[in-house]
Amino acid sequence: MARKKAVKVEADPRLNAVNEALKFIKDGMIVGLGSGTTANLFIAELGKKISEEGLNVFGVPTSFESRMMAIQYGIPLVSLDEYGELDIAVDGADEVNKETLNVIKGGGGCHTQEKIIDYCAKELIIIVDESKLVDSLGENTPVPLEVLPFAYSSVLNELLKMNSAPSIRMADKKMGPVITDNGNMIIDVFIDLNNPEEVEKQLNNIPGVVENGIFTKVDKVIVGKSDKAEILKK
């Protein structure tokens, strides 16, 4: 009888990033809880540390999904109304410039809440796997803009004047555009990001734009690899 070959199960590199990020979470901290698949892994593992090790922290969620995840895993929640400054925020990213550590976020449409909470933190940690690292920001990923619905046409016109390539993000499971947790639309735009700090400001200066997905205030990026995690700092 032929012997079956053992199937090797590859570890998720993101879990190595998550476990490294958890080392920075201490008792008594107020923690910003990011959104997205990698951030969800962090929320799940943080919940385990609370239930199994008695870690005493409070979370501030950045989206409906992260709130539901935190409740599911028993993370006590507070709001920015109670704490205007957080000790730390841990979030994922769609693209990370491996030299500058500037990132693009917002593939899930939550970047407005994410930026508010992430930028309120004393320390912002981004957790990713190696596939999210790029040499030049915006290589493969457009910058998302959350836009007031009645202003989408004027915002598109302003973006075209900036030699960019904008498009309204359309929904997969319903007719019409994607609608954010805040009731707004999303415009995705490919634009020159040689100076992301300046573009971040320029995009937000367009009337009707609520927030954009360029994040330039990252303190650490933790890159999960198959056998370890690497910490990148500015």
Curated annotation (Swiss-Prot):
Query: Gene Ontology cellular component?
Result: cytosol
Q: By its UniProt entry, which Gene3D superfamilies does this protein fall under?
A: 3.30.70.260, 3.40.50.1360
Pathway listed: Carbohydrate degradation; pentose phosphate pathway; D-ribose 5-phosphate from D-ribulose 5-phosphate (non-oxidative stage): step 1/1
For the protein in the UniProt heading, the enzyme class is isomerase
Q: Can you tell me which residues form the catalytic site?
A: 114 (proton acceptor)
Share an example GO biological-process annotation for this protein.
Answer: pentose-phosphate shunt, non-oxidative branch
Please name the GO terms that the record assigns under molecular function.
Answer: ribose-5-phosphate isomerase activity
List positions binding substrate: 35-38, 91-94, 105-108, 132
EC number(s) on file? 5.3.1.6
Q: Which NCBIfam families match?
A: PRK00702.1, rpiA
The subunit field of the Swiss-Prot or TrEMBL record says: Homodimer.
The protein's name: Ribose-5-phosphate isomerase A
User: What is the protein's species of origin?
Assistant: Methanococcus aeolicus (strain ATCC BAA-1280 / DSM 17508 / OCM 812 / Nankai-3)
Q: Which gene encodes it?
A: rpiA
